[in-house]
Amino acid sequence: MTSNFSQATLQLCYENVNASCIKTPYSPGLRVLLYMVFGFGAVLAVCGNLLVVISVLHFKQLHSPANFLIASLASADFLVGISVMPFSMVRSIESCWYFGDTFCSLHSCCDVAFCYSSALHLCFISVDRYIAVTDPLVYPTKFTVSVSGICISISWILPLVYSSAVFYTGISAMGIENLVSALNCVGGCQVVVNQDWVLISFLLFFIPTLVMIILYSKIFLVAKQQAVKIETSVSGSKGESSLESHKARVAKRERKAAKTLGVTVLAFIVSWLPYTIDTLIDAFMGFITPAYVYEFCCWSAYYNSAMNPLIYAFFYPWFRKAMKLILSGKILKGHSSTTSLFSE
C-alpha cells in the first residue's frame, strides 16, 4: 500500500524527461512562507550591503583603509544576495534546479567563492582591529591604503581560484565518480566533492575563524587593560595633558569599532558553523544528512550576508546617518560627499 501511494504521488522536475530528478514539493502555504523568508533575506543582503558600499565610497570622511575592507566585504555579501540567494531559493523550495547545467556550475562556483571571500575579509578586519587597538597611535602608519588593497586582493583571488578548481577541473570528484554518476539527474544541482576537498574547505573556514577568535580575545584583553589604565590616570590626575586626552579618545574609538566588528565575527561563526559541520558529516559518513537539515544549514550561512548591514545600523551612528542621506536623495546634492557623519 505504501509503495502504491508513493508511486501515485511521485513528481518529477521534468515530467517528460526520462532522467529527471524526483521532485519533493512543500505544501502551497509552506512554499509561500519560505519564499517570503528567503526572499526577504536576499533583498536585505542586496539593499543593505549596497548601502554600505555607497556610504564608504561616497562620503570622504569614510575613506580609510579599514572602511575600504568593510566596503569590499559588503561587496561580497551583495554578490551573494544578488547572484546566489535567488536561485538557491528556487532550488531549496522547489527541490529542483531549472537553470541548466552550465549555470549550475557557475552558481556553485560563485556561491563558494563569495562566501569564503567574506571569511577572509573578516579575518583581515580582525588583524586591522588588533593593530588599531593595541597600538592606536602608530596604527595609521602600519595599516595603510596599500596594505588594505593587498588584503582585499587576497580575499578575492584565493576564493576564486579555489572555487574554480573545485567546479571546473573535476579534481574534486576524483575517487567518487560512481557517487557523482548516481546522483546525476536532470533538474539537479548537487555539489559533491571528495573527502580531500572537504577538508580543504573546512580549513578555509577553520583557519580564518581561529585567527579571528585569537585576535579578538587579545583585543578585548588589551581593551580592558586600557580602560582600567585610562580610568586610573583620569582619577589620579585632574590636569590630564592634551596628549593623554587624545590617546584616551583614540583608544575609546578603536575599542568601540573592535566591539562592533567582534559582533560581526561572532555572527559569521554562528551562521557558518552548522554548514561546515554538516559538510564534514556528509563527506565522512556517506551523505546521511536529511535534505531539510542541509537546506537549513545552507540558509543559515546565506543569511549571514544579510546580517552585517543590520549590525552596522545598530552599532554605527555614522552608518545610520549615511543611510538617511542616501535614501532621502540628499547625496545627489553638490558637496554631499564632504558631509560630516561623526558627532565628534
From Swiss-Prot:
SMART domains with a match to the protein in the record: 7TM_GPCR_Srsx (SM01381)
Protein source organism: Rattus norvegicus (Rat)
Region forming the signal peptide: none
Protein encoded by which gene: Taar8c
Keyword Ligase: no
Disulfide bridge partners, by residue number: C21-C185, C96-C189
Function (record text): Olfactory receptor activated by trace amines, such as N-methylpiperidine and N,N-dimethylcyclohexylamine. Trace amine compounds are enriched in animal body fluids and act on trace amine-associated receptors (TAARs) to elicit both intraspecific and interspecific innate behaviors. Ligand-binding causes a conformation change that triggers signaling via G(s)-class of G alpha proteins (GNAL or GNAS).
Protein's membrane topology: Multi-pass membrane protein
PANTHER family (UniProt xref): HISTAMINE RECEPTOR-RELATED G-PROTEIN COUPLED RECEPTOR (PTHR24249), TRACE AMINE-ASSOCIATED RECEPTOR 8 (PTHR24249:SF405)
Segments crossing the lipid bilayer: 37-57, 68-88, 103-127, 147-167, 197-217, 261-281, 296-319
Topological region Extracellular: 1-36, 89-102, 168-196, 282-295
Xref: Pfam families: 7tm_1
Keyword Transferase among UniProt keywords: no
The protein's name: Trace amine-associated receptor 8c
PROSITE patterns: G_PROTEIN_RECEP_F1_1 (PS00237), G_PROTEIN_RECEP_F1_2 (PS50262)
Entry-linked InterPro entries: GPCR_Rhodpsn, GPCR_Rhodpsn_7TM, TAAR, TAAR_fam
Glycosylation sites: N4, N18
